[in-house]
Amino acid sequence: FEETQMLTGDIFASYFAPVKTWDYAGTEDNDCYKLYRQWYNSPFNNAYTEVMQPWQSIVENTDEVSPARALATIVKVFGMSRITDKYGPIPYSKFGTGIHVAYDSQKDVYYRFFEELADAIDVLTGYNSRTSEPYMERYDYIYNGRVEKWIKFANTLRLRLAMRISYVDETKARTEIEAAIGHSIG
């Protein structure tokens, strides 16, 4: 967060100001609009090694109605939403199919987010209706296996993403907002 938000984005937004002379010809320096490549690239690289690859492994080892897959998908959408908001178009729908993967437009990525969240919410709602037992409580450091909290988080994420597109695709945003706030669990 510090490197990618505060020391990169916040400097450009003038939340911070350098207290030194400008170095136009010198080394990389975010204060002088010569970005440290590592700071700028690390969120993108980490998203694929620490979010997408583990998600893909879970998908390959679970079935479509697995609560584990649903939870992993919610985490993936949360992580990748920040990446597409920061970088714009990203490799998403074809991830894992090769080295040179086409980039998806932000519209396509957001639409895919909504589909994936809807599917994950359906899986977790089905699980929650069959049992009140926590799911993988021992391994869930966020909600301790409380599936209804994951459903609420997924709907909150769905609402957040819908608000992000509300000025560019009002109809889709309205549909997703209604689905998020109309869910029986929250």
Indicate where each model-derived feature is located:
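Structured, solvent-exposed acidic/aromatic patches
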Residues: 19-75, 79-186
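A short, exposed helix-loop element centered on a Lys and neighboring polar residues
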Residues: 1-17
